[in-house]
Structure formats: structure tokens, C-alpha cells
Swiss-Prot record:
The keyword DNA-binding applies. One of its GO terms (cellular component) is nucleus. One of its GO terms (biological process) is DNA-templated transcription. Residues 142-156, 704-717, 737-755, 865-878 have a biased composition (Polar residues). It comes from Fusarium vanettenii (Neocosmospora pisi). SUPFAM superfamilies: Zn2/Cys6 DNA-binding domain. Its main location: nucleus. Keywords: DNA-binding, Metal-binding, Nucleus, Transcription, Transcription regulation, Zinc. SMART domains: Fungal_trans, GAL4. This is Cutinase transcription factor 1 alpha. Residues 1-51, 95-159, 651-757, 841-878 are annotated as: Disordered.
């Protein structure tokens, strides 16, 4: 128990929620959480009542045996602790000696799930009568002296557990039949990694070098040993937290339905078929910890008025379920490791204060990953003895952890936790979402839209991780920044968009919630990538030498995010979005504030409309996510405040200036190398074979393929890279050709006048990628407008096809293009630009085919650098890059505001 949750003494007032006769107002849906009797300070039941000794048993009771949990009826008598806690009749089955199978009482042949084993569903279960046996309350397992000195002796239960644990390794190594036995409880798996010395002994004896998952011995129950010793203090704390309470049946049903409709597709970590079967079975209910966590996540998408406060927010209800789930977790109430991982992931749906570094979404997702890796979820289970349905569930859980790891790292500016070099879990397939079992067909077949959404979301999250490592990691600041990292990331994103299945491909005329959510994450990744390369704004004294249109791409991506949000608002679906949509809107708002500096009045008007749309959406989202209220208040202070707007706009260019200086240095070094005397064999045409050194690539792309249980399939999906005849080992010469580019490299274009690219695409190895490598056509003819759908009609992009050589370039055509006051291009340069498609423009683009010009900023005053701060902003402070709202308030010099007292009734405009 955490010290903050456990009161030092029991409170004298009665515990209303603990009394069975008062539980009718919150009747639970299943029997998973009947309220245990309130701990009493007296051993007698009532005045004049008689206390009876427990009847001792020689074996586990029926309930504990059916659920495969530890039963203490043999040591403490009937009723056991579990039956007392859940007010279930504690019955010891009669011994059946040498009887045929099928007559042995309640034991069932079941396929274990993360949510414990499933019992056979009884369509008409008999009502459970309360136990007639009295019980003596459990005394605390640890006694505290008056002076606070801890005890120095073990209790009987602790000594018994220590004796059992001492033989765990012996059971693993010396029982061959045990290590090869089927794993019937997926939540009780021992993982042995390769570096463990114990692995040598197990593999040497069993000869199973590819197996890393083993069933835990039956006598090892993990934290369950502590659960059976919950004393009065711990039970009292759980009662005070309401951990055993559930909403009325109808409301519980509604919350669970909302969870599986709006949350489960994003975090598909529960086998819905088994969960619902247990939910309807009072004799074999689901884990109480998991159920409270599901209810927590369900509040984020439930519209029931019973859950809302006066402002229409479900935050108080979410906090209630969060505290209940957290109390159960802190008490070690659950010992099924997979159930714990599932619950920890869902506890991250309580996300209110991103500036809090403990018990927020970052904390819970990291703890879930640690528990999962402790059970070996990061390793392939294809060779394990898990059932097929459990193997599928484990894969879904692992890749869900991966998506949470990347998205939380992006939103909060934290380092990633999962290194795919340490994992060999195969990429998900459509079959992994099937929940059919060997003897029954699932009543919840997978939704194709949900399946494709998550598959594409996993792929997008890997690219998101590449952007983080290459553009925002600490290591990226210390190494030379290669322009090819930017183009490679863009090509990976363009390839993702081109291969996105039509069923989840979002366009304005074809709105769907899951496609909209998927593509909002895609455009947020684009903003993240190109924000690191955005110039501070053109001026006569500081022209931008880079021809890559990062600013254009970032602005267009922000416009697409706004368009998606407008469609979600029109369909009344904003409240169902996860918390990451706050970060997406945050990114779009920053881009819109930055674009307000355009001297073109029409662009300013369109940008103001977008700001209004984003602020309106943020206001609506803040009813569900408190962090949205913080961002809303922040931009209410920024918009219209010229000093704060200028501070944000100027700070954007600091990072770009560093990158630009690095590129300039690289170009100068390359130019000097080209002017140096050629070596004797430099002009010889050398044919590099496939075994010769390949051009240097970023670490995450060049690493070898992770081990896979099905190597043949992987190799068929990932063709070996083709070596370029003109390739050189030098990283600089791989993409910097200058005027003396080597033969058979792509000629320079207006898009990349200083860079020439190898004629064959690099091996962009992505673990989640199950399509062929980048096509030759995409590599040779890539244009930034391929980052957007045809219907987006990305304006004012140069024709980037390789139509001329670097030597014949007209450098005057690559300079800043002034606006003509109408958002169009001058006639003499119109031929150098093309527009893709004739589709529908995003909302806010109609009538503006060229929404910005390279020179957005008016000339700055003499002596004012575009990378410098305004006179009122101070020097040296870096612009925040995450959702830590407290950092943003400090950055703008705004006095801290209590988010619980923010006024959301400010008119927009």
C-alpha cells in the first residue's frame, strides 16, 4: 500500500459503503465485487452473539479451485479469505477417488486468458446464499511497536511463503515434464532471458534453446500469497476507497459498451469474448482490478448524465474509478501478471496533469511495460506452450504497449522505453484479432475497420519513434544532422500514406471516426518532423538557403489537422477522442499562430478561422480531458497578445538555425573534398557486390533484422537491399553530389539543388513493415505533395521531377517568391509549379490555391535577427516542445493558473 492511501488509524465513523444492506443503491453488474464485510474492532458478532471457530479443510474450496487461486481453507478453516471477501458460500468438494472425468465437480477444461481461467458459463446460475459460518477477523500480518520499530521475526505465513519460494528454481530446472507442459494460465509465466545463468541449466537439460517462456510451478503464487493475508487495516483501506463497489448494472453495462466501442480499438488488450463471458457469470467474474480499470476508461467515452458534473465533465467519475483501481493495485490484490498489465495500461486513461511526474499516463505505461517484460511479452511466443488465443492476445498487448510508449514520449517529451532491438515479437496480422476458441466461435468477430486502424497505427508509431530519435533525442544534438534523415522520414511517411488501406483512408468527403483519428496522428507526426526544420521566417538580410519546404509541409499538416477536427466536431465525435488529440491540436495551434505573420490578408483571415476552429474543439475536448482546459487557457492568453505571439514565432527558428549551420558546414567540407586532387583509382568504375559496405544510414534503419520465429516469411516480405554500382561508403557522398556527382546518381533538382541521391532506395527497415521496400518510383520521383492525399491539392510546390541537372539550375528561381497580394504565384514562375489532383480542398482552403509564400515575414528592423527574441522575452530560453503546460506558462511569463478554476466561457472572437 502506498503511504498516501493508507490512514494510520481506522476512522471511528461507520463505513456506509461497506454494509451489505446499503449496497443495493450500487448493485454490481457481475458478482466480481460484492462488498466484503466491514472489519470489526471486536471479535464478537454482536452483543450476546457467539463466535465460532472455523471448520478446517484438507483441500481448496470449490470457488478457489475453479478460479485457480490460492485457498487458505486448509490452514485457517472454512470460510476461506476469498469467500469471506466476496460473500460467496465456501464449500469444500467431496473427494472423488479414481472417478471418470466429467464427474469431478466444478473443475473445467478451460483455456486460460489474461483475465484468469474461464469457467463454463451457466445460463441460469443459482443464487449464491450468504455464508452461515461466522469468522474471526484477520489480525494485521505485521505488528507495529509503540516506538515504530519494525518487527524482527517472520509471521507464520511469511515463513511458509519463504520456504515455498526457495524451491522455485529447483522445480524449473529438475522437472522436465513441467517445463514442457502446456501453459494453462497465461498470467503465470516465468520468463528466462538469454543472459540469465538459469537459462543455461534449463536449456542444457531440456534442449529447448528457442523457448523462453515457462509455466510457474503450482506452489508459487506470486503476490497472491499476500492477497490471502489482507488484514483489517488493508481491508479497511480498500473499503474507504470503495474498491469493492460497482455502479448499478445498467450503468455498468453502458460503461463497458462505451469502452469496447471507443477505447478498445486503440488499446486492444482484452479478449472481449472471455471478458464478457466472465462478466455475465456470477460464479466466475472477471478480475476486479481489471473491471474497475475498464470502467475508468469507459467514463472517457460515456454520455450518461449520471457520470457528469455540472459542467458536463466526466472527470470526477473517472477519478473515482481511478482511485478504486489504484487502491486494488497498491494492495497487490491481483496476481495474474497479464491482468495487471491490462489494468495498468487502462489506468493511464486518467490523465489530468502532464506536469505531474508520478502516477500519470507516462508512469502507468512505463510500469505496464516493466511488468510485461518481466513476463517475457517482448519475446516471441510462437514456440511457447501458450494456447493459440493467448498467443494472439500477448501480441496485441505488446504492440499496444509499443504504441503507448511512442505516443506518450512524443506528447510529454519523454524518452522512449521500448527498444525493438530487445524484442522479437512478430508484427500483428488480421488473424491476431480473432478470438475464436477451439471449442467455440466468438460472439464478437473483429471489426475490419478497428483491425486496420490498429495495424496502421502501429506502423505509424514506429515512424514516430524514428522522428524522435533523429530529430529530438539528446544524441541527435551532438551529431551532424544529415538532410537525408529528413527525406528518408518523409519518404517513410509518404509510403505509409500510399499503402494505407482504403477502409481507414481519410478524406474530407469520406469521413469516418477511426480514419480521422488515424490521420490526425499522421499529420501530427508530419508537424513534429518538420517543426525541427522550419526556418524562422524570411527576411532580406537572412534569406533561407534551404530549398526543402518544411514550413510549407508543417502549415499544410496543421491545416489538415484542423480540417479533421472540424469534421469530428460536425459529427459530434470529439468527446470520444483519446488524450493524444490534445497534442495534435496543440501542434496545429502553434503552426497557426506562426502563420499569422503572413503579409497576405487572405492567409491571415483563413488562419484566424482555423484558430477559431481549433480553440472551439479544444474547449469541447476539455470537458473530457483536463489537460485540454490548460492548453485552452494558454492560447487564450497568447492569441491577440503581440508580444507573446512574437515570442513564439521567433523561438521557432532557434533550432532551425543550428541545423542550417550544420548543413552549411557539411556543404563546405564536401566542396573542399571535391576540389582536392583525385586519388589514382577514384575514377574507376567499381562494381560493389551485395557483401560490400553499404552507405551509412541512421542507426534505427541500418540495424539488422530482429530475430523472428518465421524467418522465411520475413525474408520474403523484406527483399535484400540492392547495392548501387556508384555507391560509396562515405556518408556524405551518399547524398551530397554537388556539381561533381558520381555517375548513375539522380541529378539535382529545384527541390534539392545541393544534394544528389543514390539511384536505388535505401533499405528502410521497419520492424512493423509487412510490405515491400520503398518502390523505385517513389524514391526517384518523390515530391513533398505525396505526403498529402490527392484531394488535399497541396499548393505551391515546385515541380520536383528530375528534369534538369545541377549545373543548369537557375538559382534565381530558387530564391524567395514574393506574394502578389492574392495568394497566387507570379506569371513568370507559374510554369515551375504544379498542383496535384482536382479533388476537394480541405475546409479553409477553397479559393486559396497558394496559401503561403516562402517569405512570410516582413523585413525585420535593422539589427534584429529572425532567430533572436523580442526585447521583452529575455534571452536564451528555449521554446517548450511538449504538452507540459507548466513549461509553456513559464515560457510566456504567464502567472500559474489553477486548471480547476479556469473559465471556459470566454467567447471565441
Amino acid at each position: 500500500m502506498s503511504s498516501g492511501d493508507a490512514p494510520p488509524q481506522a476512522q471511528p465513523q461507520p463505513h456506509q459503503q461497506e454494509q451489505p444492506n446499503q449496497r443495493q443503491s450500487s448493485t454490481p453488474a457481475p458478482s466480481a465485487a460484492p462488498v466484503p464485510p466491514a472489519p470489526s474492532t471486536s471479535t464478537s458478532n454482536s452483543a450476546g452473539g457467539v463466535s465460532f471457530r472455523r471448520q478446517r479443510a484438507s483441500r481448496a474450496c470449490e470457488t478457489c479451485h475453479a478460479r485457480k487461486v490460492r485457498c487458505d481453507a486448509a490452514s485457517l478453516g472454512v470460510p476461506c479469505t476469498n469467500c469471506v471477501a466476496f460473500q460467496i458460500e465456501c464449500r469444500i468438494p467431496n473427494p472423488k477417488r479414481k472417478k471418470t472425468q466429467g464427474t469431478g465437480g466444478s473443475q473445467t477444461n478451460k483455456d486460460s486468458d489474461s483475465d484468469r481461467g474461464d469457467g463454463t458459463e451457466d445460463p441460469s446460475p443459482r443464487p449464491v446464499a450468504p455464508t452461515a459460518a461466522s469468522f474471526a477477523p484477520r489480525t494485521p500480518s505485521v505488528f507495529h511497536s509503540h516506538n515504530g520499530t519494525p518487527p524482527t521475526t517472520l509471521t507464520e505465513a511469511q515463513a511458509r511463503k519463504e520456504e515455498v519460494d526457495s524451491g522455485t528454481y529447483l522445480d524449473l530446472v529438475m522437472k522436465p515434464k513441467f517445463t514442457r507442459a502446456p501453459i494453462t494460465e497465461a498470467g503465470r509465466v516465468a520468463y528466462l532471458g538469454e543472459s540469465s545463468n538459469l537459462t543455461l541449466l534449463v536449456h542444457d537439460r531440456q534442449g529447448s534453446a528457442d523457448v523462453v517462456h515457462y509455466p510457474l510451478p503450482e506452489n508459487v503464487r506470486g503476490s497472491r500469497a499476500r492477497l490471502t493475508e489482507l488484514d483489517n487495516v488493508e481491508i479497511d483501506i480498500l473499503h474507504q476507497r470503495g474498491a469493492f463497489l460497482l455502479p448499478p448494472r445498467a450503468l455498468c453495462d453502458e460503461l463497458i459498451d462505451a469502452y469496447f466501442s471507443w477505447v478498445h480499438p486503440i488499446v486492444p488488450v482484452i479478449n472481449r469474448t472471455r471478458f464478457m463471458r466472465q462478466y455475465r457469470d456470477p460464479k466466475n467474474p472477471p478480475s476486479l482490478l481489471l473491471l474497475q480499470s475498464v470502467l475508468l476508461a469507459g467514463t472517457r467515452a460515456c454520455n450518461n448524465a449520471q457520470l457528469m458534473d455540472a459542467n458536463g465533465s466526466t472527470t470526477p467519475a473517472a477519478l473515482t474509478f481511478y482511485k478504486r483501481a489504484k487502491a486494488l493495485y497498491d494492495a497487490n490484490y491481483e496476481d495474474d501478471r497479464v491482468t495487471i498489465v491490462q489494468s495498468l495500461l487502462l489506468m493511464g486513461w486518467y490523465w489530468e496533469g502532464p506536469e505531474d511526474v508520478t502516477k500519470n499516463v507516462f508512469y502507468w505505461s512505463r510500469v505496464a511495460t516493466i511488468v510485461a517484460q518481466g513476463s517475457g511479452m517482448h519475446r516471441s511466443v510462437e514456440q511457447s506452450q501458450l494456447s493459440r488465443s493467448d498467443k494472439r492476445l500477448w501480441k496485441r498487448i505488446w504492440w499496444t504497449l509499443f504504441t503507448r510508449d511512442r505516443s506518450v514520449a512524443v506528447a510529454l517529451g519523454r524518452p522512449v522505453h521500448i527498444n525493438l532491438d530487445d524484442a522479437d515479437v512478430e508484427m500483428l496480422t488480421e488473424d491476431d484479432f480473432i478470438e475464436d476458441e477451439q471449442d467455440r466461435v466468438s460472439e464478437y468477430p473483429p471489426d475490419p475497420i478497428h483491425v486496420q486502424f490498429f495495424l496502421e497505427y502501429v506502423k505509424l508509431c514506429e515512424i514516430m519513434g524514428l522522428v524522435l530519435s533523429q530529430q529530438y533525442s539528446v544524441a541527435s544534438k551532438g551529431r551532424q544532422r544529415n538532410a537525408i534523415d529528413l527525406t528518408h522520414s518523409d519518404m517513410a511517411l509518404a509510403d505509409w500514406l500510399q499503402n494505407c488501406p482504403k477502409i481507414v483512408y481519410w478524406e474530407v468527403p469520406r469521413h469516418h471516426f477511426w480514419s480521422a483519428l488515424l490521420h490526425s496522428n499522421y499529420y501530427t507526426t508530419l508537424c513534429l518532423l518538420h517543426r525541427a526544420h522550419m526556418p524562422p521566417g524570411g527576411s532580406a538580410r537572412f534569406p533561407d538557403p534551404s530549398p526543402y519546404p518544411s514550413r510549407n509541409i508543417a502549415f499544410q499538416a496543421a491545416a489538415m489537422i484542423t480540417s479533421i477536427v472540424e469534421n469530428l466536431a460536425a459529427h459530434d465525435q470529439l468527446r470520444y477522442c483519446p488524450a493524444f488529440v490534445v497534442y495534435s491540436l496543440f501542434s496545429a495551434l502553434i503552426r497557426h499562430v506562426y502563420q499569422m505573420r503572413s503579409p497576405v490578408p487572405s492567409i491571415q483571415q483563413v488562419t484566424q478561422d482555423r484558430l477559431r476552429s481549433c480553440m472551439s474543439a479544444m474547449k469541447e475536448i476539455s470537458r473530457v480531458w483536463l489537460v485540454g482546459k490548460m492548453v485552452y487557457a494558454l492560447f487564450e492568453s497568447i492569441i491577440g497578445n503581440k508580444v507573446l505571439e512574437e515570442r513564439l514565432q521567433k523561438a521557432e527558428g532557434k533550432r532551425h538555425r543550428k541545423m542550417r549551420q550544420t548543413l552549411t558546414t557539411q556543404l563546405e567540407q564536401h566542396s573542399r573534398q571535391q576540389e582536392a586532387p583525385k586519388r589514382k583509382y577514384d575514377e574507376m568504375a567499381i562494381d560493389f557486390g551485395t557483401n560490400t559496405p553499404q552507405p551509412q544510414e541512421s542507426y534505427e534503419r541500418s540495424r539488422p533484422q530482429t530475430p523472428s520465429a518465421v524467418k522465411a516469411e520475413t525474408s520474403s516480405m523484406q527483399p535484400p537491399p540492392v547495392s548501387s554500382p556508384g555507391a560509396r561508403q562515405s556518408a556524405a557522398d551518399t547524398f551530397m553530389g554537388g556539381t561533381n556527382s558520381r555517375p548513375q546518381t539522380r541529378p539535382a533538382t529545384p527541390f534539392n539543388p545541393s544534394f544528389s541521391v543514390p539511384p536505388t532506395p535505401p533499405d528502410l527497415y521497419l520492424v512493423t513493415r509487412n510490405s515491400p521496400n520503398l518502390s523505385q518510383s517513389l524514391w526517384e520521383n518523390f515530391q513533398p505533395d505525396q505526403l498529402f492525399p490527392d484531394s488535399a491539392a497541396m499548393p505551391a510546390f515546385p515541380n520536383l521531377s528530375p528534369i534538369q541537372t545541377h549545373a543548369s539550375l537557375d538559382h534565381s528561381a530558387m530564391g524567395p517568391v514574393p506574394g502578389n497580394g492574392q495568394g497566387g504565384m507570379p506569371n513568370q514562375q507559374a510554369g515551375q509549379f504544379q498542383q496535384r489532383g482536382n479533388g476537394i480542398l480541405p475546409q479553409g482552403f477553397q479559393g486559396h490555391t497558394n496559401m503561403w509564400q516562402p517569405n512570410l515575414d516582413p523585413n525585420l528592423p535593422e539589427g534584429q535577427s529572425p532567430d533572436s527574441w523580442s526585447s521583452t522575452s529575455g534571452q536564451g530560453q528555449a521554446v517548450p516542445t511538449t504538452l507540459n503546460v507548466e513549461d509553456w506558462f513559464q515560457f510566456f511569463g504567464i502567472n500559474g493558473t489553477d486548471p480547476n478554476h479556469l473559465n471556459l466561457d470566454i467567447p471565441l472572437g
